Amino acid sequence: MSARLFIALTIMSAGAQGQTAKQLRTTWGEPDLQGIWNGETLTPLQRPARVANKPVLTPEEAAKVEADVAGRPGRNARAERGTEKDVAGAYNQIYAQRGTRLADRRTSLIIDPPDGKIPPLTPEAQKRKDAVREYMQALLQRTSGGKPGPPSLRHNEPPPFYNVDRLNRADGPEDRSLMERCLAGTLPKLDAHYRMVQSPGQVGITVDWGQGSGFVRTIPVDGSKHLPASIRSYKGDARGHWEGDTLVVDITNFSPKSDYLGSRQNRHVVERFKRVSENRLEYTVTVEDPTTWTRPWTAMEPLEKQSDKENQIYEADCHEGNYGLMDMLANTRAAEKLFKEEKGPNPRTMDIATGGGVDPADQKYSFGRAGAE
């Protein structure tokens, strides 16, 4: 091949790539964010202590993490049959989304603060957390997952705040967790699948996360103002606008019945969606709540485009909540009846919260799930 022909082909190739980038726009001229985007990742939300001084892994370290995860056996076999732990582990890993790659070798999705950690709780938030923990532990007393002693009299008390966790009680649906009630989806939502569609003045996002925890969002991008502060919802009130090629979504008006890492109605979320190439979209989110954290924090998650022909995101159906919750409440009423007739144990001595001893108010995660370390 002559040098002149090689240069001509190189220029044509560069021009074609540039043209492709320009074509990633809708027919009405906005950046095209549409498609199915995969956010599954092995990168945790917070940086684990063992890599506290290493924001980015080496290629060799990242490859080892991916190989170690790939080599872990799935939860396909039951253990300790007949125990509460066995019942709590009724699923194998096919029901749980687990990433297989460290997309950009970072050790945390959080990029600010630089230490990759969620900022400390405010004194007010710590008091809330302690109050909830004490209440939940009191309800576990005398069970396999709690301290010894007689069942606590706090079983007769309402929770200190609107309950979002699994209490060791089933007096009514409000005693069960938001996930059991099919209300688990909240914002921000990381480590998920997204179907994005656009029309003039609106962006729609279908979120698929875990088992029955998805939801649908419709975001106005028309310059409209937020709803009055008196109108609250689980997903908040979202309003979008464009800053160059970045879609910025401002979310306020969260319900006090929603929860994200202890933050409720005072949560303020700002999302940024930017398509950086044909197959990659950067999702950056800043979370602020002066009643929960001492400062705002920001996370960035790379999203990879998936084939529309080979993949589909369906509406999330939470059938467990539709059917299982009623059965759970009915079973508790039956257990109470048997106890009253001296034919069964006191239901308050049965652990229906932790699955056998793990404090649900103190869940921790590391590599393999975008949650708190």
Where are these regions (language model features)?
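Sec-dependent signal peptide recognition
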Residues: S2-A8
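PEST-like low-complexity, intrinsically disordered acidic/proline/serine-rich tracts
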Residues: G18-E373
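N-terminal signal peptide c-region/cleavage motif recognized by signal peptidases
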Residues: S13-G15
